[in-house]
Amino acid sequence: MQTILLQHATDAYGISSDFLIQDGIIAKRAPAGTLQDAADVVIPAKGLTIFPGLFDMHVHLRDPGFTQKEDILTGAAAALAGGVTDVACMPNTKPTIDTPETVQYILDKAAPTGVKVHPIGCITNGMKGESLCDYPALMQAGICAISDD
């Protein structure tokens, strides 16, 4: 079990605190300079802001179909490097995100990445603007929104 002590970190409300993190979970929070627990790693965080994780509502993972541009694994790694823990991926893939099978492909490929990927389903089949997708089936499969972007 790894323990990290962040000293004098500022939260989103501007409050300076010490944080004890055990196995990636905040175990304790105390006023800045007061937490004296032993830790494997001590990080002086004065001037730094701590967030539980950011959510990027508009990403183009391009997987399936355009993995030469981006794929779920590289997109997730880039997100984590920037403190982003959740992303909503746009449906302009090939095939487009207009079937439950494509939604499941994305969710399965994203599962081991450490990033929660929220697929956005198409409004219309193939993003062609001709016929509406089966929204109930897409929602049951796990989409978080719809778009023809």
Give the ranges of each region predicted by the language model.
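Metal-associated gating/positioning segment near the N- to mid-region
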Residues: 48-110
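Hydrophobic "anchor" residues on beta-strands that sit immediately upstream
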Residues: 3, 52-54, 118, 144-145
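Histidine/acidic-residue-rich, glycine-tolerant segments that coordinate divalent metal ions
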Residues: 93-105, 109-149
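Hydrophobic/aromatic beta-strand patches that form the interior of the parallel beta-sheet core
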Residues: 41-43, 55, 88, 118
